[in-house]
Curated annotation (Swiss-Prot):
The lineage of its organism: Eukaryota, Viridiplantae, Streptophyta, Embryophyta, Tracheophyta. The chain crosses the membrane at residues 10-30. It catalyses: S-ubiquitinyl-[E2 ubiquitin-conjugating enzyme]-L-cysteine + [acceptor protein]-L-lysine = [E2 ubiquitin-conjugating enzyme]-L-cysteine + N(6)-ubiquitinyl-[acceptor protein]-L-lysine. This is RING-H2 finger protein ATL39. Pathway: Protein modification; protein ubiquitination. GO terms for biological process: protein ubiquitination.
Length: 132
């Protein structure tokens, strides 16, 4: 029996281990280069990165969306008293400030949706693109 036949399992394990280590080293190198480009201020290189953080809206754009006090809008639509903010899952209460998100016209607590929109430019309910 040849040497390779007796140690076939060991050889397969060794090649699999070498492949895994090579994959890890290449992945580490790619991440390191991407982080260096971002730290050096190379915006174009960082922009070409496959993993970009989600972009939200700026504070000025968020504040431009209509806001109102819940007690003023409660009588407009029947059943509005049962509404809740889907971001924090709390019911709307009197004297709380709400914000309306165009174009889908969903309503949320102003503080909740402001935080959401600063990280994401989509509606928390329907994922419609929110454009200021």
């Amino acid at each position: 029996m040849s040497y390779f036949k007796r140690n076939e399992g060991t050889i397969v394990f060794a090649f699999a281990s070498i492949g895994f280590i090579a994959f890890y080293i290449i992945n580490y190198y790619i991440r390191r280069c991407r982080n260096r480009a971002a730290a050096a201020g190379d915006i174009e290189e960082a922009r070409m990165s496959p993993r970009r953080p989600p972009r939200g809206l700026d504070a000025e754009a968020i504040k431009s969306f209509p806001s109102f006090v819940y007690t003023e809008a409660r009588g407009i639509e029947p059943g509005i008293g049962e509404l809740e903010c889907v971001v924090c899952l709390n019911e709307f209460k009197d004297d709380e400030t709400l914000r309306l998100v165009p174009p889908c016209v969903h309503v949320f607590h102003a503080d909740c949706v402001d935080i959401w929109l600063s990280h994401s430019s989509t509606c928390p309910i329907c994922r419609a693109k929110v454009v200021p």
